């Protein structure tokens, strides 16, 4: 518990830089505590935040997923403006608890938030062709002859990010079709695909 309060040489102590009030529990067996920060849960239990985190880990057999509110918006925007920057999502997939809203709304959030500051024709390459090129993924990320037909058809005027930290499992509005390898994987009317059309890229 003492180590949780101090910076460490062997691992990054995000708590030391953010504070327990910016560490939110997003999963676990006690549903009433999901969505609350660790400091708040600790106060309700009559424990220090460090003791509370230890108890949560024990109660959930080591699986107590959390979200850190540690980003500086000014830093994010300064990097985003760079022509060399790309945007990806590292959202984790789970059927339980509250996933990070980026799992459902990363790219719609990006477009909706910055469409008045960055032309959409400059935003789209940051989430398609540029990441594919950076990762060395051939034949994907662009609408070109011979490339895989991975296509998202959107209505820009209808596009709206719906995912929030409180209600993250919401798909964005305004996405008409998602096409994977030339086959329709998702339609805006809620109709899903009859199969899985993607494959592992290594």
Predicted regions: what is each one?
Residues 78-84, 89-90, 101, 151-199:
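C-terminal cap of metal-dependent C-N hydrolases
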Residues 64-76, 120-124, 132-169:
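Acidic, glycine-enriched loop/beta-strand segments at the rims
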Residues 1-113:
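Active-site neighborhoods of metal-dependent hydrolases
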Residues 106-133:
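Gly/His-enriched, cation/cofactor- and phosphate-binding structural elements
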Residues 94-96, 113-116, 162-167:
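Short beta-alpha connecting loops at secondary-structure transitions
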Residues 50-53, 65, 119-125, 186-188:
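Acidic/polar loop patches that form or flank catalytic/metal-binding clefts of enzymes
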Residues 59-63, 93-98, 131-134, 160-162, ...:
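Flexible loop/turn segments at secondary-structure boundaries
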């Amino acid at each position: 518990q003492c180590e949780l309060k101090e910076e460490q040489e062997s691992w990054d102590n995000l708590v030391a830089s953010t504070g327990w009030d910016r560490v939110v529990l997003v999963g676990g067996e006690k549903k009433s505590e999901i969505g609350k920060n660790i400091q708040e849960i600790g106060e309700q239990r009559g424990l220090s935040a460090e003791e509370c985190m230890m108890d949560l880990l024990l109660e959930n057999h080591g699986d107590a997923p959390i979200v850190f509110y540690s980003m500086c918006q000014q830093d994010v925007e300064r990097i985003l403006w760079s022509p060399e920057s790309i945007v990806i999502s590292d959202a984790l997939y789970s059927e339980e608890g509250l996933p990070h809203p980026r799992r459902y709304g990363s790219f719609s959030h990006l477009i909706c938030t910055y469409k008045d500051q960055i032309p959409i024709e400059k935003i789209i390459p940051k989430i398609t062709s540029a990441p594919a090129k950076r990762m060395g993924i051939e034949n994907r990320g662009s609408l070109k002859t011979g490339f895989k037909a991975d296509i998202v058809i959107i209505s820009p005027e209808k596009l709206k990010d719906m995912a929030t930290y409180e209600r993250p499992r919401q798909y964005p509005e305004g996405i008409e079709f998602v096409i994977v390898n030339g086959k329709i994987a998702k339609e805006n009317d809620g109709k899903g695909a009859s199969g899985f059309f993607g494959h592992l890229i290594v």
